[in-house]
Regions:
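Glycine/proline-rich active-site loop of Rossmann-fold NAD(P)-dependent oxidoreductases
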Residues: 54, 79-95, 103-105, 110, ...
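C-terminal "lid/loop" region of Rossmann-like NAD(P)-dependent oxidoreductases
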Residues: 112, 141-142, 150-181
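Catalytic helix-loop patch of NAD(P)-dependent Rossmann-fold dehydrogenases
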Residues: 1-11, 15, 19-20, 28-73, ...
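C-terminal amphipathic/interface module of NAD(P)-dependent oxidoreductases
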Residues: 179-198
Length: 198
């Protein structure tokens, strides 16, 4: 779906002459990245979700360059908030913890929990997409995160409850950390919601 669905929407957007196409890409395309990670970092997709999301981004940039569809790709780091995904192999840790907490089950921390993630609240994500849509920028790629990594152990402590540790998955990064200088400069965007309040 990430690839076929995206190309279908790109083609429909081209035919409808939409003013701007914003693609929700994923920071997972960076794999085990050097941090903080900027948009020029080498791509290293380590699992199927990352690969298909990156293929969707490639398609978006292709339509932008070849068919002149004004498009921007935003590589979202670790978004969280209401209606966050709670299931699936690559479900966001925040959503998984929340589901476990509501079911009175222990929180399952992958690895030792010292790994960090660049969590960004969903309203900050929405604001970035709105600014991108209204901007004159096109054929650009932006990282989107808070640029303040938080440990999984800290997240588990904030949510509260019993914690059990499970083995680390292959290709699991120790840290995700967005360099957001480009999006700040181009779109005048900045994160607002502190981690503790989200």
């Amino acid at each position: 779906t990430n690839v076929v669905g995206t190309t279908n929407v790109l083609e429909a957007s081209k035919n409808a002459k939409v003013k701007k196409f914003i693609y929700a890409a994923s920071s997972s395309c960076y794999g085990l990245a050097q941090t903080p990670t900027d948009e020029k970092h080498v791509i290293s997709t380590e699992y199927p979700y990352a690969l298909t999301k990156y293929m969707g981004e490639l398609a978006t940039m292709h339509w932008s360059k070849i068919y002149k569809l004004p498009a921007i790709s935003i590589r979202i780091f670790n978004a969280y908030g209401p209606r966050v995904r709670t299931t699936g192999l690559y479900g966001a840790v925040f959503g998984v913890f929340l589901k476990q907490k509501l079911a009175n089950k222990p929180l399952t921390v992958v690895g030792d929990g010292k790994q960090t993630r660049d969590f960004l609240y969903v309203t900050d994500v929405a604001k970035a997409f709105l600014l991108a849509a209204k901007s004159k920028k096109k054929n650009e790629i932006y990282n989107l995160g808070a640029s303040k990594p938080q440990s999984i152990n800290r997240l588990a402590k904030i949510i509260g409850g019993e914690i059990i540790y499970i083995p680390k998955r292959p290709a699991e990064p120790d840290c995700t950390w967005a360099n957001i200088k480009k999006i700040k400069r181009h779109l005048k965007w900045k994160p607002i919601v502190p981690f503790e309040y989200g």
